Amino acid sequence: MVDILAAPQQTKADSALRTLTGISIAHWVSHFYIFVFPMLFPFLKEQLGVGYIELGFALTAFGLVSGLTQAPIGYLTDHFGARKVLLIGLAVGGCALIGLGLHLSYPALIVSAVVLGLANSVYHPADYAILSAHMDNARMGRAFSVHTFAGFLGGAVAPAIMLALVATVGGLGALIVAGAIGPLVALLLIAMGVPDTSAAERKAAGAEAPKQNIVTPAIMMLTIFFMLLGLSNAGISNFGIVALMSGYGVDLATANVALTAFLAASAIGVLAGGFLADRTHRHGQVAAAAFGINAVIMLVIAIASLPSPLLTALLTVAGFLGGVITPSRDMLVRNAAPPGAAGRAFGIVSTGFNFSGIFAPLLFGWIMDQHMPHWVFGASVVFMVLTVLLALVTERKPAQIPATA
């Protein structure tokens, strides 16, 4: 009898592990694709005879399209199935790169960036909808953390992979080979049997759509929360090296070590945060506490001249705490999403990250142009304080259960 009862549990556990593995691989592809164009900028500049402004416009097109289509793709995810949307996104994104490799021109680059941005918009709503439907609630935080870590890993290895491809098969070949990864991963997910969101959930979502207002105050606050998270991290990630070199007397090697420590600690923090998210229901307080400490750390960096070892140590702690809150951040969205609307909820709030990616380079670039490198960290403090306040406001209170006689 014990063996008969244990078999379904093992099968369910195996299915959950297979699902998490497949979705995490897809998220790896998402972040890998984000870095394909930037890694090929020297090749594209030489081949197309354009400047970095023209190449930057391709990234702007990617970001705008990805940001504006997240919410509509979330709607499609809830109504037609997350698995279908995810597979199409993988295939379309890959074909965008393959097409550019077969016919390289500046107009083709812009078209490819637009299509790649559209494909990129599927991952968050589709991935989180599948994970929310098929992961054990007791391990949901850890599932979200592994999924996020896989994305971090995709971005981390992209430079090495693209450089190796350019060295072996050239720039055009690198585009084609990188593009082939998307369709191949789509076939892998089919072979692995990654499940869809259930037909019952989609039917319920469709039946309730006219009555259901997904754009709730909590979802809108979380969208702003995501944007503030992006803004608070973007200055450090993108302008941290130049700020440390110009304002703190730090050499390039030391600045690189400090930023690498910050990013590596963030990835480790994501995994640790998954265990924490599964052991508490107070996800907003976890996020607020971690970012509150980070705000103090960044304030110290902004106003004090610190020795390089201490500066690196503080950035390492800040990176770890920034990673720790990520699973709790995702749990806040899941808790705020109405039943059957996880795809739409994650699609809407993820636009906050996309728009922070548009605004942050302008803001922090202006700060550096004004020769105020300390304000790269000072502005991050402001955004972190606002993030702390929103984390506390947006935490959804558990419903009160009426007492029974």
Outline where the language-model segments fall.
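Helix-to-loop junctions at the C-terminal end of transmembrane segments
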Residues: 69-81, 270-282, 368
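Cytoplasmic helix-loop-helix junction between adjacent transmembrane helices
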Residues: 112-150
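Extracytoplasmic gate region of multi-pass secondary transporters
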Residues: 37-38, 218-263, 267
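Helix-loop-helix hairpin linking two adjacent transmembrane segments in secondary transporters
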Residues: 147-193
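Juxtamembrane intracellular "pre-TM" segments in multi-pass secondary transporters
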Residues: 2-14, 196-222
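Conserved MFS/SLC helix-loop-helix module at the cytosolic interface between two early adjacent transmembrane helices
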Residues: 68-104
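Structural signature of the two symmetry-related core transmembrane helices
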Residues: 84-98, 285-300
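Residue-level signature of mid-helix packing/kink "hotspots" within the transmembrane helices
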Residues: 35, 63-71, 155-156, 263-267, ...
